Regions:
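Ubiquitin-like/PB1-type beta-grasp interaction modules and other compact soluble beta-rich domains
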Residues: 1-90
Length: 91
């Protein structure tokens, strides 16, 4: 399943500056694994040491927040859009 992944500015160093990349995978976990295969180092910025989504990174498949779906097992149908959005904090 080919999906379009929108890459935030802070992670574009891993994608050669590309704002969008294509990835394969039937689930979000598969998409992240494919991203890592083609853009080494990006998975460590999205996943923690236990392989779970980092607390301050929001991921959407189409318009659905995966935290309220099936997490890393959320289906990524062909043609879906995946958005990686790091939380912004300030004080």
């Amino acid at each position: 399943m080919s999906v379009t992944v929108r890459i935030p500015t802070i992670l574009r160093t891993y994608t050669g500056g590309q704002a969008e990349v294509q990835a394969e995978g039937a689930t979000l976990a598969g998409v992240i694994a494919d991203l890592e295969k083609n853009h080494t180092g990006i998975a460590a910025r999205v996943l923690d040491d236990q392989g779970k989504l980092r607390r301050f990174v929001n991921v959407y498949v189409n318009d659905d927040d995966v935290r309220f779906e099936q997490g890393l097992e959320t289906a990524t149908p062909d043609g879906a859009g995946v958005s990686i959005i790091p939380a912004v904090a300030g004080g």
